[in-house]
From Swiss-Prot:
Family recorded in the similarity comment: Belongs to the UPF0329 family.
Organism whose genome encodes this protein: Encephalitozoon cuniculi (strain GB-M1)
Biased composition (Basic and acidic residues): 350-359, 369-381
Name the UniProt record assigns to this protein: UPF0329 protein ECU02_1540
Chain intervals with Acidic residues compositional bias: 382-396
Chain segments annotated as coiled-coil in the UniProt record: none
Length: 616
């Protein structure tokens, strides 16, 4: 949770010029965070913010080299200026022209509790004194002296290297200013307050001195270089591309909701430990491992520590082992196929020899020999026809029975499935229970086998009902439009069943507030091979990043230990209680579900909008 809070302070304060770090009124801080989270903060979260406000933060950050415009990715790490869509070039230039300042704020990031205007002024002074010396980023990106221009990731690295000279200047002045403030600590402070103030200023001074060292500057540049290379590498991997871009898009949606007044969607800033990142790269020298470390830090919100690094190494080695097994099986299959072809070729040669021999016998044996040869030829032709008929019987259509969500049973065949047909699923009872009243849900949960759901208050159940009672999403996942909205994750085994997820970006609106998050659909393979939905919810972004309730949407795993496989339904005859209505609409880019007040259907209680996968 602390990383998420620090990240929000950085995004709201450091990156976009808010005075979050200077606020003396806790109510103002709370208001900013509640707008970001689109809900009232829990007491525990308020307490964490209070603690955070009192802590010095020198966390290191990196830039994710993507440019979004609305729901489109208009520039990838490897995109050159001439490859940008003509209609988006002016917009991309508006983003690129800000790169020097954005990168500088990233490199000079210091969060100081209480009044820190002296640091902000220092950051501005150093930047304004040196910015005019270096080439304009837009000119660099256009590549005036080069036909091909440079890639976006190369431009980001050039700006980082240009800013290194400012880092030394900033570090020296930061250390001097911190020392001056140590000497000027008011004598009116109590011994405890004086000690605390001095400790904080000494840490700032030490940070400034480290910024002056060649090692720290090289580490800063190298960390960003690793991120650029990893982003480009992950983007090229089919199995990772979609989850990566959906996470990037989700973060952009968060910023747009928090700051609707901004018309430029700048590249994302992410908190990543530079030292851990660089040392891991030096130790393993493996792009596969670095990509896995980055995925865990950025997509699955796990941070970089010894445990996550070890997990990444194990994941890569296991993936390599499985790939080697598949390659061995493929080689074995090819060898068996080659041997089979050779045997078939030998049989053909032998058959041709027999036919030639029979032809010679015909000339020698007269009419009788010819008749015998003809009879034998008929017998062989008959055997071949029998073989063909047997093969046709084996490949004949086998009738299957599939169950559509909310529909009747229908017969299908392996060859008879039409291209326009949708997907077919069963719905588990643990999903359907959320359509009941909060009181009935509580009674069922208290008697159930899932310990984490027991003894919840009615208020908690009502809050959970808002994000779980979305069974209408099944109308989208069974439709042929499903793949435009949902991304399918890799399969994994848990509780004796094969499971996987479908994930989409979404926005939940209630009471004039919006929450950005993921719409999660958890599925498992039933005993008859059917796909069963056992988990369905809208997971707000802040709970995902804070590690609350099940972790990342894209992670391989879930918090449901055991599923009673027999408790599923095809949704036939399902109806809400009388008077409750919702309206579903889709325009191809958004699938919208409006939940209305049963007593006044003109009143919309909440709206869930599922967004199409970003256009690339």
């Amino acid at each position: 949770m602390r990383v998420w809070l620090v990240c929000m302070v950085g995004l709201l304060g450091g990156l976009h010029g808010s005075n979050v770090e200077e606020s003396e009124d806790m109510k103002k801080v709370r208001k900013i965070f509640e707008k970001a989270f689109s809900r009232k903060l829990y007491d525990s979260e308020v307490e964490r913010i209070r603690k955070l406000e009192k802590e010095l933060c020198l966390d290191t950050r990196v830039m994710i080299p993507f440019i979004f415009h609305g729901d489109r990715v208009v520039a990838l790490p490897t995109t050159r200026y001439q490859d940008v869509d003509k209609s988006e070039k002016k917009y991309v230039e508006k983003v690129v022209v800000q790169l020097r300042w954005l990168v500088w704020r990233l490199m000079a990031w210091v969060y100081v509790p209480g009044g820190s205007s002296w640091i902000r002024d220092l950051i501005n002074e150093v930047f304004e004194a040196t910015v005019s010396r270096d080439p304009d980023p837009v000119s660099l990106y256009k590549g005036a002296r080069r036909r091909s221009g440079i890639r976006l990731m190369d431009l980001v690295m050039k700006v980082f290297k240009q800013n290194v000279s400012m880092v030394s200047e900033f570090g020296q002045r930061l250390a001097r200013s911190a020392e001056d403030r140590i000497q000027g600590i008011p004598g009116s402070l109590s011994p405890e307050e004086r000690k605390k103030e001095e400790e904080m200023l000494r840490k700032i001074k030490e940070h400034g001195e480290r910024l002056c060292t060649k090692e720290r500057q090289e580490e800063m540049v190298r960390a960003q270089e690793i991120i650029c290379d990893v982003c480009a590498y992950v983007w090229e991997r089919d199995e990772d591309r979609m989850s990566f871009i959906m996470e990037v898009y989700s973060r952009h949606l968060c910023l747009k909701i928090v700051m609707p007044y901004t018309d430029i969607e700048v590249p994302l800033i992410s908190y990543i430990d530079h030292h851990k990142l660089v040392s891991t790269d030096e130790k393993y020298k493996s792009m596969n491992i670095m990509a896995e470390v980055f995925k865990q830090a950025f997509i699955e919100h796990k941070g970089i520590d010894d445990e996550s690094i070890n997990n990444a190494v194990r994941e890569v080695r296991e993936r390599k082992r499985l790939e080697e097994m598949r390659e061995m099986e493929e080689r074995k299959r090819r060898e068996e196929e080659r041997a089979k072809n050779e045997e078939e070729l030998l049989r053909m040669v032998e058959r041709e020899k027999r036919e030639e021999s029979k032809g010679r016998g015909k000339k020698k044996g007269g009419k009788r020999g010819a008749g015998e040869a003809k009879e034998e030829s008929k017998e062989e032709d008959g055997k071949e026809e029998e073989g063909v008929e047997a093969e046709e019987e084996e490949s004949a259509e086998v009738p299957l029975v599939e169950t559509a969500v909310g529909g009747a049973r229908r017969k299908k065949s392996l060859k008879g499935k039409r291209k326009g047909d949708g997907h077919h699923y069963k719905i588990h009872s643990r999903v359907l229970r959320w359509k009941r009243s909060a009181e009935k849900i509580k009674r069922e949960l208290d008697k159930g086998s899932e310990e984490r759901w027991k003894n919840r208050s009615i208020e908690e159940i009502k809050e959970q009902k808002k994000v779980h009672d979305i069974v209408e999403v099944s109308e989208l996942i069974k439709s042929k439009e499903c793949d435009r909205f949902f991304f399918r994750t890799g399969k994994y085994m848990k509780g004796g069943s094969e499971r996987w997820k479908m994930v989409a970006n979404g926005i939940l609106e209630e009471g004039g507030e919006k929450k950005v998050g993921k719409v999660e659909v958890g599925l498992f393979k039933g005993e008859r091979g059917e796909s069963v939905v056992y988990h369905l919810m809208f997971r707000p972004t802040e709970t995902e990043r804070a590690g609350m309730v099940g972790g990342s949407s894209f992670g391989k795993g879930d918090d449901v230990d055991e599923i009673k496989k027999e408790e599923s339904s095809d949704m036939s005859g399902f109806r809400y209680p009388p008077g409750v209505r919702c309206e579903m609409t889709s325009n191809g880019n958004e699938f919208r579900i409006e939940y209305r007040n049963p007593k006044n259907t003109s009143e919309v209680l909440r709206t869930l909008t599922i967004l199409r996968i970003p256009e690339i």
